[in-house]
């Protein structure tokens, strides 16, 4: 469904605190990023504007049974998938995983300075 080569897929909900901290920075990753919102179009657009989310987003709706989330086995948000050149999953990052996010951070432009995440 969303198997785009060399892409970061990010499943999220607008009510997720970790998503609110993470998504505004993902446009800086040096690869295409596709957000997959589990909320309706209005809530998703409001979230994108409020938190200055600059990545493309598509909807994965409850009314349709969350087809993309089910296809990728997503049970928590945020869940991110790094897809390789064949469009296959190279890495899965679920929730807040500091080590995985640091590896993902290596994809940021050298000139970007992302603030350290300190939950709680």
Whereabouts are the PLM-identified features?
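Aromatic-flanked redox-active Cys/Sec active sites in thiol-based oxidoreductases
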Residues: 11-16, 38
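Active-site donor-binding loop signature of nucleotide-sugar glycosyltransferases
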Residues: 38, 60, 95
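Short acidic-hydrophobic, aromatic-tinged amphipathic segments that line or gate anion-handling sites
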Residues: 56-63
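Short, conserved active-site loop motifs that form the nucleotide-linked donor/cofactor pocket
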Residues: 31, 55-56
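A short, acidic/glycine-rich surface segment
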Residues: 65-68
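Non-globular targeting/processing and membrane-anchoring segments
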Residues: 1-7, 21, 28-34, 42-45, ...
């Amino acid at each position: 469904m969303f198997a785009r080569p060399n892409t970061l897929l990010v499943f999220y909900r607008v009510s997720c605190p970790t998503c609110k901290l993470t998504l505004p920075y993902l446009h800086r990753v040096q690869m295409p990023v596709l957000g997959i919102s589990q909320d309706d179009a209005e809530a998703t657009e409001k979230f994108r504007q409020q938190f200055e989310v600059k990545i493309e987003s598509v909807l994965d709706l409850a009314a349709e049974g969350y087809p993309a989330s089910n296809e990728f086995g997503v049970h928590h948000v945020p869940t991110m998938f790094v897809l390789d050149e064949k469009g296959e999953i190279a890495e899965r990052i679920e929730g807040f995983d500091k080590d995985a996010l640091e590896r993902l951070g290596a994809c940021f432009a050298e000139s970007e300075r992302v603030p350290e995440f300190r939950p709680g």
